[in-house]
Amino acid sequence: MTDTTIRLTQTVKGAGCAAKLAPGDLDRALCGLDLPVDPNLLVGLERADDAGVYRISDDLALVQTIDFFPPMVDDPYSFGQIAAANALSDIYAMGGVPKTAMNVVAFPAKTMDISVLRSVIEGGLDKMREAGVVLVGGHTVEDSELKYGLSVTGFIHPDRILTKKNLQTGDCLILTKPLGTGIVSTAIKAGLAGSDLTERVIRNMTALNRDAALVMGDFTVHACTDITGFGFLGHLAEMVVDSGCGVRIIAADVPHYPEALEWADMGLIPGGAYNNRDFRGMFVDFGAAVSRRFRDLLFDPQTSGGLLIAVAPNEAEQLVAALKATGIECAAVVGEVVEEPLERIVVE
């Protein structure tokens, strides 16, 4: 079996970020842990943020994250690129600059040709090279399924950290990539997605969030996260709860893959979407006009999704224009931060 014949999605049970442990299970596993206290740990496990931040000096802090998962596309090289872009995204979401990375690999050596792993690593390495990141090592284990990702370290100024918990009333929320990758990945696995859509989704998933992060650095951004395995509403709920505010989302303005809605109608929805809804659905109020399939889309676990940026309202149009000017064509204002209802997401 070689990398020219294998369909990676047929070799795994889960796909991409949809393979994450259910958020409720993770919450129970972490609840009540006696975490070490360190005054230089600026962002840690006490909040569900995108990366940890540790202060080295008054003007330098380390940003650290790790992300890996099974393949959501069939091509090994593309999978490597997507996994690397997804892992690097956490650093960008915090406002940091990624510097070094280490490979995390699980590989079924008895059933898969080693050329597959070579292609995966080459894809990841090329994406790291594009990001200006140095690969310094890695770790492998033999497993029944292929998994790949990165542990990433970046730099940030301690006073310029972006977290999920600083939403301000009136902020506009901007999304930089379309939703629906979890549903589309399920369709790819089922052999239903055509080549044009598959190529378009791969292009978006391999796109670094670097350009969006660079652009938002010139604006008054109060909070940011990247949309990944807990879905749009799952990650937004974390922001709302941590910030002590509410959010209003306009469903018609949310960028998405139209094909994902068609497959949602067919029930082609990853299990992670149901886990996300079960855990965070209590924070969401849907208007009567929001269809069931669109509700499913908003809980769909994303792989290498876009940034969700909270920006001062008087700068929102300029930020969207600047994002589009860099090639992020789907960037759009999808909602606003409101004072009430407290800790609620209203989708209209």
UniProtKB/Swiss-Prot annotation:
GO biological process: selenocysteine biosynthetic process
Gene: selD
Essential cofactor(s): Mg(2+)
UniProt keywords, alphabetically: ATP-binding, Kinase, Magnesium, Metal-binding, Nucleotide-binding, Selenium, Transferase
Gene3D superfamilies on file: PurM-like C-terminal domain, PurM-like, N-terminal domain
NCBIfam families listed in its UniProt record: PRK00943.1, selD
EC number: 2.7.9.3
Binding site for ATP: K20, R47, A48, D49, D67, D90, G138, H139, T140
Lineage per the UniProt record: Bacteria, Pseudomonadati, Thermodesulfobacteriota, Desulfuromonadia, Desulfuromonadales
InterPro entries hit by this protein: PurM-like_C_dom, PurM-like_C_sf, PurM-like_N, PurM-like_N_sf, SelD_I, SPS/SelD
Enzymatic reactions: hydrogenselenide + ATP + H2O = selenophosphate + AMP + phosphate + 2 H(+)
Organism of this sequence: Pelobacter propionicus (strain DSM 2379 / NBRC 103807 / OttBd1)
Cofactor binding note: Binds 1 Mg(2+) ion per monomer.
Role of this protein: Synthesizes selenophosphate from selenide and ATP.
Protein name: Selenide, water dikinase
Subunit note: Homodimer.
Family that this chain belongs to: Belongs to the selenophosphate synthase 1 family. Class I subfamily.
Active site, renumbered: C17
Primary enzyme class: transferase
